[in-house]
Swiss-Prot record:
Name the UniProt record assigns to this protein: Sodium/hydrogen exchanger 3
Family: Belongs to the monovalent cation:proton antiporter 1 (CPA1) transporter (TC 2.A.36) family.
Entry keywords, A to Z: Antiport, Cell membrane, Endosome, Ion transport, Membrane, Phosphoprotein, Signal, Sodium, Sodium transport, Transmembrane, Transmembrane helix, Transport
Membrane association type: Multi-pass membrane protein
Domain notes: The C-terminal intracellular domain is subject to extensive post-translational modifications and binding partner interactions which regulate transporter activity, scaffolding functions, downstream events and localization.
Organism from which the protein derives: Didelphis virginiana (North American opossum)
A GO-annotated cellular component: plasma membrane
Assembly and interaction partners: Homodimer. Found in the forms of complex and dynamic macromolecular complexes. Binds NHERF1 and NHERF2. Interacts with CHP1, CHP2 and SHANK2. Interacts with NHERF4 and interactions decrease in response to elevated calcium ion levels. Interacts with PDZK1 (via C-terminal PDZ domain). Interacts with AHCYL1; the interaction is required for SLC9A3 activity. Interacts with EZR; interaction targets SLC9A3 to the apical membrane. Interacts with SNX27 (via PDZ domains); directs SLC9A3 membrane insertion from early endosomes to the plasma membrane.
Cytoplasmic side: 80-87, 135-137, 209-210, 285-286, 329-335, 395-407, 473-839
Activity regulation information from UniProt: Seems to switch between active and inactive modes in response to various stimuli. Activated directly or indirectly by membrane phosphatidylinositol (PIs). Regulated by a variety of auxiliary proteins, which facilitate the maturation, cell surface expression and function of the transporter. Inhibited specifically by the drug tenapanor.
Phosphoserine, modified sites: 560, 568, 598, 613, 669, 724, 815, 818
Region (Interaction with AHCYL1): 597-701
Taxonomy of the source species: Eukaryota, Metazoa, Chordata, Craniata, Vertebrata
Residue numbers spanned by region Interaction with EZR: 581-595
Function: Plasma membrane Na(+)/H(+) antiporter. Exchanges intracellular H(+) ions for extracellular Na(+) in 1:1 stoichiometry, playing a key role in salt and fluid absorption and pH homeostasis. Major apical Na(+)/H(+) exchanger in kidney and intestine playing an important role in renal and intestine Na(+) absorption and blood pressure regulation.
Amino acid sequence: MPLGVRGTRREFRFPVWGLLLLALWMLPRALGVEEIPGPDSHEKQGFQIVTFKWHHVQDPYIIALWILVASLAKIVFHLSHKVTSVVPESALLIVLGLILGGIVWAADHIASFTLTPTVFFFYLLPPIVLDAGYFMPNRLFFGNLGTILLYAVIGTVWNAATTGLSLYGVYLSGIMGDLSIGLLDFLLFGSLIAAVDPVAVLAVFEEVHVNDVLFIIVFGESLLNDAVTVVLYNVFDSFVSLGADKVTGVDCVKGIVSFFVVSLGGTLIGIIFAFLLSLVTRFTKHVRIIEPGFVFIISYLSYLTSEMLSLSAILAITFCGICCQKYVKANISEQSATTVRYTMKMLASGAETIIFMFLGISAVDPAIWTWNTAFILLTLVFISVYRAIGVVLQTWLLNKYRMVQLEIIDQVVMSYGGLRGAVAYALVVLLDEKKVKEKNLFVSTTIIVVFFTVIFQGLTIKPLVQWLKVKKSEHREPKLNEKLHGRAFDHILSAIEDISGQIGHNYLRDKWSNFDRKVLSKLLMRRSAQKSRDRILNVFHELNLKDAISYVAEGERRGSLAFIRSPSTDNIVNVDFSTPRPSTVEASVSYLLRENVSTVCLDMQALEQRRKSIRDTEDTVTHHTLQQYLYKPRQEYKHLYSRHELTSNEDEKQDKEIFHRTMRKRLESFKSTKLGINQTKKTAKLYKRERGQKRRNSSIPNGKIPMESPTRDFTFKEKELEFSDPEETNEYEAEEMSGGIEFLANVTQDTATDSTTGIDNPVFSPEEDQSIFTKVPPWLSPEETVVPSQRARVQIPYSPSNFRRLTPIRLSTKSVDSFLLADSPEERPRSFLPESTHM
């Protein structure tokens, strides 16, 4: 066994990983000292097969190594769940950065790598903020927008002013010693240390899993207070440059005006680029492969444009992601949406890892440290105390107008969750040492504040939340009943506000929804995407999906899946579901799903994403059963490689074909079952009629029947159906589309010998015997009758003399699609069919 690798496997990993890191660091240093001959060297050298060019790839190679080290660090941290469940990942990364920074400084005695403001603001911060805005829950964010703005604007100004003035007051007392700091310097430091950092809040609060309202308030405050922070920082920085004697009242008014310009201007830039991105993705149907590129490039351009105009870049990219997510997700393909989602998460996670690790590395630099115990400790005390006071005062004011009150427990978590991070560090590093004499003291204090809030408060916030029993978020999909009631409550509250003449959240949301549906969606979304957003069809699709899962799971539990594997209809109808085994899946299926009116629509893509059952193993087996045995495509799809476009989604074609097949079968079965017509007799009748029609056509000249009265016959015809965007159609797409069912209206001629088409309906035939409808079904009592009104008797022709009240369909342990087998050619009659049938 090699030296230093003794012990268990867990003890084996970290030493080898550390030695590997040290070797990667020392190897370039050792090889980089080799003397490279200059152009003036007269030494003759022969041809070299391999040359070492470290200086040629030094910068990108080091960047790649640091990214690799950060990624490996996350893997090592998550090897032990006990560590990550107690210590936040951000705190672990800072500690790792301190260790790596110590190794680097011990090797060179120079802080070779630090977190610079340029790298942070232009390359690391945008992916994190874009990810937060693109996946922002819009309903929750805009519902609490007033509360978020109050905390972000008033709260940040309160924290900056009170912290700066309090430090200045203590400085005048002489406790801090001899420091060359003025009032404007203290206010400048208070403005940069007062802002809550979005990166730190995301890193800690996502692991705590507090309730959605509390999370969105703290996180929204950390995003939107950027405008206040930038304005205060720029105002006081310019005042320090001018000097306290030259600052006038006009300059103060300009500073207040600049706040509105910076915040509203950054928001407007983000909205404009969001609409531009949505409009571009509307026309990317034939260039699907570059759709994710548009999302990242245009969003990043909004950030750079705002930075170029001295506006709030964080607000710009945040609102760009918020405003474009709905239209972009509807326009781009499924593969592009998946690419955008995972790429954005990867970039945000990687940037967050690098930020915290380099915060630790940057701290290992003796040149930036200036220690003043009184200044550092008082800063920690003031930012904590004034944060709590500001939250309590603002919450007391907000609770007078909020429908859902913020309790004392929520206020404690909000006060304790005011974390500072890399934004404060980057701003303090930007200070000019010639203008701010005590810059190193400000930098040292900021590093201590960041480490204290991220490490200490991050370690203790989870036990605090558990001790206070704060309500946590429920990670589950809302049920259909909850969605329906939520929509009903929204309409009711909107109506109440409209009647009372008040303009509230519900009224504004309703007006915005109408404007979006009538104007924005038509402008920024493709027509096919607008059709797919129909809520009724979405609910119908989800019900069919649950129906399909229950259908296959029931047959699987009975131990017989032969009827699924066999494509023959004869084998399907011979399956007996009269006494199925009770299953637990039926408990999760609603009453509506057990009725005879549902339809099986097997959507494999949605099944993979939305299936939720009791046992994961059963779900897996059901999924593979549906995918392997329940559908056989009509043709083999060609898999072609192309660098410029993606292959068409086969599941989408299969889903649509399955839907049309199923609807055709269910519609025919529903007609035959309802009217008491046997499937075999109906098929035989249609076959005889078609054969007689062919004989008559052969005997008539030109194959045409004399026209008496043209009628339209709506029949089902097999045709190659193209499922594509109606506004964008090409010839080559029509050749690749799979077959389907199309409803066609054909003009036919009625003759004396053949005047009826399709299935005869005895209700509208006066010569038919109506005795079948007067019989009392076995499940009704003679007293359950309903007398129709005189108007009903006049409007309903050839109706039976007595009507029976429709009772609810009885619950059954059968699969919901087993009722389709009612019209099968069986010898014994079904219990729910009439005793006699009529042609």
